[in-house]
Amino acid sequence: LRRCARVPARPELKWPNRRAHAAPLPARTFMDSEKLAELVADACDDRKATDIRLIRVDEVSSLADWMVIAGGQSDVQVRAIARSVEDRLETEADVLPLRKEGLNEGRWALLDYGDVIVHVLMPDERGYYDLEAFWSHGESRTFLPSV
């Protein structure tokens, strides 16, 4: 059996999958998690979400810093709210969700942005799962849109 020759190291490549002659990436400005949560709530409000709640969970959980919980009256509205959040955060904060769930069914959409987790639920699901009560030990506030 012949052994494959080892590929010599290329010192001009400092990072995997990045060529030495590639232009440096622009510096990203990171938005803090509270501002990101407020941007999410504002995007939910753009699509007429009901009872938008922001819950600070960073002191009680390592899962995220903020939970944003919003209501939609139909599966179409739940999907529209979730799309509004995705579009707004991509354009204004330059972030994409790490994971998305429930967009096809439209009864409970979940968008995970790492520091901020977004739940958009229909009234039956919101009442049944009662996420506000589950996270009641975190600081909670209702989103009030600016006029």
Describe every region a protein language model picked out.
Residues 10-59, 73-80, 87, 101-103, ...:
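Long, contiguous binding/interaction regions
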Residues 91-100:
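Active-site phosphate-binding and catalytic loops of NTP-dependent enzymes
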